[in-house]
Curated annotation (Swiss-Prot):
This is Uncharacterized protein aq_aa19. Keywords: Plasmid. It comes from Aquifex aeolicus (strain VF5). It comes from the Bacteria.
């Protein structure tokens, strides 16, 4: 039973990691400059929740995956530096910037 639970945990962490890393790779400053409604706020909220989960389970994550998380963390930190002073009237983008700020704070307080 314990082995099944660990396999399930590994699979869910792996799936979470794929989302976390792919969002880091494909989200850039241009996504924050759009004037039409966007799902960026939702996507970054999902990323924030995944990062919280990864931080709680970091002792169960293999070293290679830890390195991928750290690279993704760096991309999110760099992205936040680019967009933190961006002025926009789009409420989705405003929320996305706030969520990204929360993600950056989590990365700094809960390093992996």
């Amino acid at each position: 039973m314990e082995r099944i639970r660990m396999k399930t945990l590994e699979k869910s962490l792996e799936d979470s990691l794929k989302i976390y890393v792919s969002e880091a790779l494909y989200t850039d400053i241009e996504d924050f400059k759009v004037d039409y409604p966007t799902a960026l706020d939702f996507e970054l909220t999902q990323v924030l929740l995944i990062r919280e989960d990864l931080a709680k389970n970091k002792e169960n994550i293999p070293q290679q995956l830890l390195d991928e998380i750290r690279q993704a963390d760096k991309r999110y930190l760099d992205l936040y530096e680019q967009v933190k002073d961006l002025k926009t009237k789009n409420p989705h983008i405003q929320v996305a910037i706030k969520v990204l700020k929360a993600l950056v704070e989590l990365i700094k307080t809960e390093p992996i």
